[in-house]
Amino acid sequence: MMDSRILEHPHAQFGGSLGSMVGMGFPYHLGHHHVYDISGHQLQSAAAVPFSIDGLLNGSCSGSVANSNPLLGSGCGVNGDSQYKLGDGGDPDKESPGCKRRRTRTNFTGWQLEELEKASNESHYPDVFMREALALRLDLVESRVQVWFQNRRAKWRKKENTKKGPGRPAHNSHPTTCSGEPMDPEEIARRELERLEKKKRKQERKLLKSQNKLLAGELFHTPGSDSDSGVSQSTDSESTPHTGPQHSAHRQQTEHICEQHARHQRASTVNETAEPMDSTRNSGLCPANGITRASTLQKLNPFSVESLLADSSPRRKTILDFSQLPPQRPLVGKGHFLLYPITQPLGFIVPQTAMKQSHDSGNSGHHCSTTDTSTSNQKNVNHLCRDNTGASDELQRETKNSSIQSPSTSSEKCFSESNSPQKESENDSESTVTNSSQKESISANLSEYSDRKSRSSADTNTDGEDVDMD
């Protein structure tokens, strides 16, 4: 800001540098020949200090050192008294036509607001005399009273024309139809009732959905749920024909294993270590308490109300009953479907211990296991025992192949595979006759196999002696 005291000296001239300095805050460029070209009435009105910035910028205002800001006083006021008011801060409610000074916000006291409210209740449109009387009595400016009444009328119109509550979107009229006519109050009430009913139904659906989700989560974690059935009733039409034959084959295989277990219990009681594990395994596979696979097919969806309220015992036993067995891979997938088609019955693992050959021949009806007890080494021979009408031929081929195999693991796996499924209409007498004939053929083949093994061992010993003699 340039100090105006420099220009108070009577001999001060407008030089080039001074003209450039004045040009920063002055909109007109001043030069040496433009100094005295200002209009004559402005120079005469500013005769006291002819060359002051205030006199040049404000032709009608007298120069003053108190007003150090020439831009603020430019064109402001009609007489010189307005500059002294601006220097003191001025009256904020004083309206000057040429001054664009920002007005501060008027803060009304509680008493002033009460008096204004009383006046607005009497009349919404007070005349100028009433506004001036209120301004004198409330120590306000008449313009502020006028603005307050304008705002109060706008507030009243909004309140009268709008029926909105807190939080509702603002609308300034009653609900109307498409043609713009006002709606019937009964129609408005009916729509409001429909809106409330729709909101209530939505909340009920949300609550029911959350309950079903929670119930489904609990059923997935319960060990006794009926989710281990081979087929689910709520499947698609595409996957149903694939799962039906698999389930029927699985049922026939389970029945076949149970029949073998019954024959084995009647046959012999040798091999006491392997016997309890077979009975435990087969008891888990055989149907108990009248629960069959057919009843599982007829059962409803496991998530239905009937299946939830039914008192069903768990199908699978806990891991404590099978603690000495290796972990098994589940045959049922996540969507209760079989992971792969089963073409043979489910096998079970029989832990093998050191047994004599007599025990093996006595227990050959079910386990079909052979042990080579020679003085040099002991061999565990893995062979596949097939329980069908042509079992004798299959056994001879397997024994020939098994004599060449090297010593393998200490446990033998016996898989009973039925290539031709038994028919349900077969009589008990015929099945017992065929089983006895099969047992006789298997025992005869085992005796021939033992003789052949003894001869082969003798031949190998003589061959070894010949090599030593050479």
Swiss-Prot record:
Reported tissue expression: In the somite, it is restricted to the caudal half of the newly formed somite and sclerotome.
Bias type Basic and acidic residues, positions: 252-262
GO biological process, one term: nervous system development
Record flagged with keyword Nucleus: yes
Any one Gene Ontology molecular-function term assigned to this protein's record: DNA-binding transcription factor activity, RNA polymerase II-specific
Main location: nucleus
SMART domains membership: HOX (SM00389)
PANTHER family xrefs: HOMEOBOX PROTEIN UNC-4 HOMOLOG (PTHR46799:SF1)
Further information: Marker of antero-posterior subdivisions of the somite.
Protein name as catalogued: Homeobox protein unc-4 homolog
Protein source organism: Danio rerio (Zebrafish)
